[in-house]
Regions:
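Low-complexity, acidic/polar, glycine-enriched regions of mature
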Residues: 17-218
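Hydrophobic h-region of N-terminal signal peptides that target proteins for export
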Residues: 8-17
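Positively charged n-region of N-terminal signal peptides that target proteins for export
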Residues: 1-4
């Protein structure tokens, strides 16, 4: 993997552009996937009905201009005017109803909803807190890699987490954001579900995959 410079984007600080914000929302191809295993088989539940909202304090033209310069290697102007290559960390919030997850099995879906206490805590939520360091550009894949901190809400419990994310510009109005988060259900007070009088037992390990297509709102 060939990597480019450590790009100091998405950092707090002065920026040389107007403050007209850009709002992005989740497109139809977005999904959040929960994956785990039991003593019998692996399981997977996928949710596509969600509210995801990102607000960047920079106009869309500036965001695209920064990406253009990075991908063209034309960044010399930032050596004397680094503020032109910056914009603040976005505000981002994701909410997905637990009842929207589909596992291909109604019994499994019911077990998952009970385990996550969907009646009391109907949503899985994530709120972006901060960017950890800079953004690395992979010259071979065109992906941007970073580590972010945020708050994950699951089954009524909230935990601050760090997660590695990758981002890609699909077009000048759409961006793909992907992250894979391994965690333990018990960290959120969730008892791994059982079925058939305890003969099938889910394991504690859970992987949450975020695969979001964010589109600039009109």
């Amino acid at each position: 993997m060939r990597t480019g410079i450590l790009i100091l984007l998405l950092v707090a600080g002065p920026a040389a552009h107007a403050s007209e914000p850009t709002r992005l929302a989740a497109g139809r191809q977005s999904a959040v996937v929960l994956e785990g295993s039991s003593n019998v088989t692996d399981w997977r539940c996928r949710g596509t009905s969600m509210d995801a909202d990102m607000l960047v304090a920079a106009p869309a033209d500036h965001i695209n201009a920064v990406i253009d310069r990075i991908e063209d290697g034309n960044i010399a102007v930032w050596m004397s005017e680094p503020a032109r290559g910056r914009f603040p960390t976005p505000r981002f919030h994701l909410r997905i109803p637990v009842t929207s997850f589909r596992c291909g099995n109604r019994i499994m879906e019911g077990d998952m909803r009970r385990a996550l206490r969907a009646g009391e805590h109907p949503d899985v939520e994530f709120t972006l807190g901060a960017l950890r360091g800079g953004v690395q550009h992979d010259l071979d894949t065109g992906l941007y890699h970073a580590t972010i901190a945020g708050e994950l809400g699951l089954a009524g419990q909230r935990r601050t987490i760090d997660v590695a994310v990758s981002a890609q510009r699909i077009s000048r109005s759409s961006f793909r954001i992907r992250a894979v988060l391994p965690l333990q259900m018990s960290d959120f007070g969730v008892t791994p579900p059982t079925a058939l009088f305890g003969t099938i037992r889910a394991r504690d390990a859970l992987t949450v995959t975020f695969d979001l297509m964010l589109e600039i709102a009109p």
